Amino acid sequence: MLKLTDITWLYHHLPMRFSLTVERGEQVAILGPSGAGKSTLLNLIAGFLTPASGLLTIDDVDHTTTPPSRRPVSMLFQENNLFSHLTVAQNIGLGLNPGLKLNAAQQKKMHAIAHQMGIDNLMARLPGELSGGQRQRVALARCLVREQPILLLDEPFSALDPALRQEMLTLVSTSCQQQKMTLLMVSHSVEDAARIATRSVVVADGRIAWQGKTDELLSGKASASALLGIKG
């Protein structure tokens, strides 16, 4: 279980403050206007930002100040952060061993994830030789191969065409269910959120303004629907 209790980040001396509980294996969408604090929330969970105050626990262990490299979290960005001089296999392998010295079990795990992502025929290629969708599959494989209990998505598929974006969302959702991972996904699209997350959190002005069923939000009946431009 992921739990944030009054986790506070000072942005130009204006506090953003979050309290949130997410159960193990739950898939949650994080929505809200631009600049509301959605990415800040993910970066606090991932450890890329250190809160001024508050408590963050994962499975009842205090990770409030744990460095990102030691936090049981993986994060996928819109910019996939693949190393251009490394092959697909090497980029995925970094998720298992930063020195890329993989034993037989790790090699097997890497190829299993690549097969699951549909990129097992691309392992010798460089990122520059791949399409945008293929690069995001590689980046997702690198996250999943780490087998961390929490996966954070900061709009990684927003630049893809609609059909490919839906394909990637389905792939993420299915993979998280298979690995029993907790998923938190920032999105500007309530429709995308509804496809994989039964629960949504709406962030506004550095606070969690609303949380509840995604369908209720999409129907326009929720108090936060208007924040997203949804009319009942």
UniProtKB/Swiss-Prot annotation:
What InterPro entries does the record tag this protein with? AAA+_ATPase, ABC_SmlMolc_Importer, ABC_transporter-like_ATP-bd, ABC_transporter-like_CS, P-loop_NTPase, Thiamine_ABC_ThiQ
Signal sequence extent: none
| Locations listed in the record | Cell inner membrane
Q: Which GO terms describe its molecular function?
A: ABC-type thiamine transporter activity; ATP binding; ATP hydrolysis activity
Q: Does the keyword Disulfide bond apply?
A: no
Query: Coiled-coil region(s) at which residues?
Result: none
Alphabetized, the UniProt keywords read:
ATP-binding, Cell inner membrane, Cell membrane, Membrane, Nucleotide-binding, Translocase, Transport
Alphabetical list of Pfam families matching this protein: ABC_tran
The UniProt record gives the binding positions of ATP as 32-39
Q: Reaction catalysed?
A: thiamine(out) + ATP + H2O = thiamine(in) + ADP + phosphate + H(+)
What does the record give as EC number?
Answer: 7.6.2.15
- What is the protein's membrane topology class? Peripheral membrane protein
Domain ABC transporter, first and last residues per copy? 2-230
GO cellular component terms listed in the entry, alphabetical order: plasma membrane
**Chief localisation class:** membrane
Quote the function comment for this protein: Part of the ABC transporter complex ThiBPQ involved in thiamine import. Responsible for energy coupling to the transport system.
Q: How does it assemble?
A: The complex is composed of two ATP-binding proteins (ThiQ), two transmembrane proteins (ThiP) and a solute-binding protein (ThiB).
Q: Which family does it belong to?
A: Belongs to the ABC transporter superfamily. Thiamine importer (TC 3.A.1.19.1) family.
Which protein are we looking at? Thiamine import ATP-binding protein ThiQ
Look up and give the organism this protein is from: Escherichia coli O6:K15:H31 (strain 536 / UPEC)
